[in-house]
Amino acid sequence: MRTPYCVADYLLDRLTDCGADHLFGVPGDYNLQFLDHVIDSPDICWVGCANELNASYAADGYARCKGFAALLTTFGVGELSAMNGIAGSYAEHVPVLHIVGAPGTAAQQRGELLHHTLGDGEFRHFYHMSEPITVAQAVLTEQNACYEIDRVLTTMLRERRPGYLMLPADVAKKAATPPVNALTHKQAHADSACLKAFRDAAENKLAMSKRTALLADFLVLRHGLKHALQKWVKEVPMAHATMLMGKGIFDERQAGFYGTYSGSASTGAVKEAIEGADTVLCVGTRFTDTLTAGFTHQLTPAQTIEVQPHAARVGDVWFTGIPMNQAIETLVELCKQHVHAGLMSSSSGAIPFPQPDGSLTQENFWRTLQTFIRPGDIILADQGTSAFGAIDLRLPADVNFIVQPLWGSIGYTLAAAFGAQTACPNRRVIVLTGDGAAQLTIQELGSMLRDKQHPIILVLNNEGYTVERAIHGAEQRYNDIALWNWTHIPQALSLDPQSECWRVSEAEQLADVLEKVAHHERLSLIEVMLPKADIPPLLGALTKALEACNNA
């Protein structure tokens, strides 16, 4: 045990309890003394980032792979830069703890006009800004620090959302008592009467259903129930699909998997399997505009049984207080009795194998990439042509597929990939990002090179903001960006650039380069030249829906 033991040590021990081995962030004068304890910690490794926005994205990517992450910024200027990323973590249910190093308690009490403040002697402005985008918050004092750290962390673990701790510089050094027990959050259990009522209602519906299908989404992943869903479809063969954020839950090459459900933009086979079912088991779903091609999904309450993290629904009746794992266990048992295999002729397995010739287009790019993906990959696809083109990829077992279509902050994936590779150094990380998106967060390439990471980064260069062009202003210069020499950037961002770069414009070139980088131990950047106006089919349907909504 470290002596003298203080609040900083207590917080670091609790981060370890939550599963974090790293702390992302940017140093600032109000958090430097806390950082001394981080550097001395045997369990937590400091990971400095190029800026706070990137650090928040990196922490998010890390948490999606490890289940929890922590981020450190400095008061005011640092924390505000990170709030975009924290808001995305909140929207998409990712538990990232935001620790903010703040001015000392005495200075705050005196209302001193300090740097990084608004000059009004008030120190809670930014705390209040964080309240809507975190599930629990605390201003730590010498008296409450240990209790509040535990409260915020247990709430985060239960709700799978971010938390916020303001840590004044002096409080970090105050004496604390080491924790006796590891931090755990108690698994909730449903009231027996409520669970029975849900079971009875679900059984009545399933018993009358001739065709039952399963539709899963990202909240299954956030609550650690991926393997439960995989086991479910093995024990009870039935048609199943995911939404975009839930890709990777299933082995997408197995029988019974139909693809990605996206409302009217779904393939005919997926629409028939899901919308044509008498009963659809919707587990961990969120029917957002970008996931449903503008709310074009055709699923009625009467047709669905819905399972959310802390409640379940049959028809129009909600049963609150039922944890997702218990609802799933109940439905698996009922499905074994009442669901019989039907409409099981899928999966097509994969996009047809390409003939690698001709200039690159959206179509032959994704077909070529399909042959490159292998079990265990971590794939991050940025908002836009990357995410919505990847929707038709058929992922093998144990692939992590990371997208951010609800929050939709372009540039997210480059920095999130840094976090993902930090969490999983021995797995292959593949980044799919547009040129416009990459310009927002490219600095984190330097951090990847510093830490000797070796992701495979594909920059889809279509000369600007293609999604925005598809929505509105196809020829307007506000959708243009500066044209960069992408293959030279890694060299500029490291004095020891252990990287290789390529620019490809032909399908055969891409196939050859992918074969070269398949087992590389260095960072690989591939600039993929694509037509300016070429977009994946789903993105075309989505942009039309968004344009109509904006004009309504």
Swiss-Prot record:
It comes from the Bacteria. One of its GO terms (cellular component) is cytosol. It is an enzyme of class 4 (lyase). Mg(2+) binds at D435, N462. PANTHER family: PYRUVATE DECARBOXYLASE, PYRUVATE DECARBOXYLASE ISOZYME 1-RELATED. Homotetramer. Belongs to the TPP enzyme family. This is Indole-3-pyruvate decarboxylase. It comes from Enterobacter cloacae.
